[in-house]
């Protein structure tokens, strides 16, 4: 399939620059997975589409204040570093701006030496592997020195960094938020539990793939970057029980979806496991894990439009997006949501 088949027209004015005052007041487009029927609701109405015995799966990753501004030690030149993925111990995959002059052996200083980053490997497209040197706990240093890494299409400064975290964010390690989860409030989650709907958590740390567009014409030639994921025994047991009893698994976000489908593909059931996934879901993929999907509206020609198209159909998704544009839904990270069920 050609990447152009996943394009759609989006006025720039519909790209949400700030979150709404109340998380669950976002609009919700409900799409019939098979029928293509469309309903227009508000996000808090999502509970009416969930049934007793269903399990809602949330990604509990936490976004790190991973954008750092510092100096190249040798020259004093200014440099920006976006930490993306922990490779092992204190070695991180990062994006640098400008990257061209940062070579293996060069050191960057942040916060007058509170964090020193040494380049140990050069990657393509501005990527580097950096070894970090610091005292104490890294997260404390990042909270002191770093900024929240908002997506490039958000031009306005975020007044409250917590609005780019889900209310249940726990496991620090992401370079971007799992944005479908931003719509949930603690109160809505309590109401969902009270209805007899299970809530389960997985972790997938959102990394480099989120920032990279598809650069090939034929989507079969696209290579996904790997992201770290983890599922606990408690979550695995709950999901297997949900399937066994004939209830539905509703995935919140494409990150949860990729984790669940990776595990079902590799093990034929849900198991306690951690690892790296580069799963690429596009039309022709057979879903084995999820029965419903809550997600935001994604960038034209992105792998995420392909993922949701594989769950419903390309025609249904592009028709729903066209309707959302017509009715001036808010798009992307701080935008409105879609339930495909």
From Swiss-Prot:
Matching InterPro entries: QueA, QueA_dom1, QueA_dom2, QueA_sf
For the keyword Cytoplasm, the answer is yes
Q: Where is the signal peptide?
A: none
Q: Its annotated pathway?
A: tRNA modification; tRNA-queuosine biosynthesis
Catalytic reaction list: 7-aminomethyl-7-carbaguanosine(34) in tRNA + S-adenosyl-L-methionine = epoxyqueuosine(34) in tRNA + adenine + L-methionine + 2 H(+)
So which domain of life are we looking at? Bacteria
Its annotated compartments are: Cytoplasm
GO MF term (any one): S-adenosylmethionine:tRNA ribosyltransferase-isomerase activity
Question: Mind naming one GO cellular-component term on file for this protein?
Answer: cytoplasm
Annotated keywords: Cytoplasm, Queuosine biosynthesis, S-adenosyl-L-methionine, Transferase
GO BP annotations of the record are:
queuosine biosynthetic process; tRNA wobble guanine modification
Give the EC number(s) under which this enzyme is classified: 2.4.99.17
Top EC class of this enzyme: transferase
The keyword Transit peptide is assigned to this record? no
Family membership noted in the UniProt record: Belongs to the QueA family.
Q: How does it assemble?
A: Monomer.
Physiological role: Transfers and isomerizes the ribose moiety from AdoMet to the 7-aminomethyl group of 7-deazaguanine (preQ1-tRNA) to give epoxyqueuosine (oQ-tRNA).
What name appears for this protein in its UniProt entry? S-adenosylmethionine:tRNA ribosyltransferase-isomerase
Task: Name the source organism.
Answer: Staphylococcus haemolyticus (strain JCSC1435)
Output the lineage of the source organism: Bacteria, Bacillati, Bacillota, Bacilli, Bacillales
